[in-house]
Amino acid sequence: MKLQKPKGTQDILPAESAKWQYVEGFAREIFKRYNYAEVRTPIFEHYEVISRSVGDTTDIVTKEMYDFYDKGDRHITLRPEGTAPVVRAYVENKLFAPEVQKPSKFYYMGPMFRYERPQAGRLRQFHQIGVECFGSSNPATDVETIVMAAHFLKEIGIQGVKLHLNTLGNPESRAAYRQALIDYLTPLKETLSKDSQRRLEENPLRVLDSKEKEDKVAVENAPSILDFLDEESQTHFDAVSQMLENLGVDYIIDTNMVRGLDYYNHTIFEFITEIEGNDLTVCAGGRYDGLVAYFGGPETAGFGFGLGVERLLLILEKQGVALPIENALDVYIAVLGDGANVKALELVQALRQQGFKAERDYLNRKLKAQFKSADVFAAKTLITLGESEVESRQVTVKNNQTREEVQVSLETISQNFSEIFEKLGFYTQ
């Protein structure tokens, strides 16, 4: 049997992982500006953490979760999304305590798992970046979080992004709308897809964002949630809309957007861009004011979003956005002869300890092959070290781009290479 990676997974090799590191680092910098701190939760959780919060009738729970019983007969699941684990951690660690500053702002990054048909930008092990903000029911929190997502997408280079906005109202508004939707869809039940016929019984709002053609036709004239908002829900949505306009953020009200998870209320949103004629959601989220209490904590407002890293990178690639990744070596040492082996090791280590990205030859190759390696590594400078250089303690350092050279001592390289580096036209940070 040929051993290969499981279906729906990928090996992220160095050329690609550099892009991942850039995106993750970029997200960290943006989130830091908004006073978010990182939280890391387990990759697996108790089954109930996900099933009860995400919703027993959602596709995630009924079709897509990787769940199993461990050797202690505990029902475990690999996390399929990030919000429920973060809320569980928030409650379990009593981060709602009075001494903790509010609102509490967290971000997370890491792998998630869903058993679904693998396709471009959608794998069974995928990676998510997300944020969660606890303790503020102020509509300004909704807007700040949406704007932070827009800030990230714009600065990372995603083009043609449109903000789709909707509200699910408070529980009372949602219940009234749910019944209106049942009344509207029940006579059309036989025209719905099999999945939506089931959803009509269990969670009729999910029929609205079905991708099946027959379902799209059925909901064309469905009642709008906006007609069922009570005063509280309408006031919240109006405030969010007005603040977005005040900040110059364009949006589209999309009343068929409901999101795939059951815990949302009030504001929900998606950032969508078009790739090769298809609409792709690049980031999505919303408000979930009941989730902390559901996990046994006090009544606490919550708002957050998540985005898939694989899909983000796919969109950047399709849009021709080149990430500014710096892979070049600062120094490459070509080694000539056994007599230079020890000194080359000392020298490359001294350079690294000064903060330079440095490499040397270990394979006793001909100089031509070593110079080729220096070019492959895009080395900025090149040092050739042979036995004669070791004896004289003088070497030539070459700018590998302009071919300019300087003659310096080994001691100078070991102690103050930045002076040589700058002399050859490069700048140290």
UniProtKB/Swiss-Prot annotation:
Enzyme Commission number(s): 6.1.1.21
Keyword Aminoacyl-tRNA synthetase in annotation: yes
One of the GO biological process terms: histidyl-tRNA aminoacylation
Record-given protein name: Histidine--tRNA ligase
Compartmental location: Cytoplasm
Organism: Streptococcus pneumoniae (strain P1031)
PROSITE patterns linked: AA_TRNA_LIGASE_II
Family recorded in the similarity comment: Belongs to the class-II aminoacyl-tRNA synthetase family.
GO cellular component: cytoplasm
Molecular-function GO term, any one: transferase activity
Principal EC category: ligase
UniProt keyword Ribonucleoprotein, yes or no: no
Gene: hisS
PANTHER family reported for this sequence: HISTIDINE--TRNA LIGASE, MITOCHONDRIAL-RELATED, HISTIDYL-TRNA SYNTHETASE
HAMAP family: His_tRNA_synth
Cross-referenced Pfam families: HGTP_anticodon, tRNA-synt_His
Assembly and binders: Homodimer.
Catalytic activity field: tRNA(His) + L-histidine + ATP = L-histidyl-tRNA(His) + AMP + diphosphate + H(+)
Broad class of the protein's primary localization: cytoplasm
Disulfide bond sites: none
Keywords: Aminoacyl-tRNA synthetase, ATP-binding, Cytoplasm, Ligase, Nucleotide-binding, Protein biosynthesis
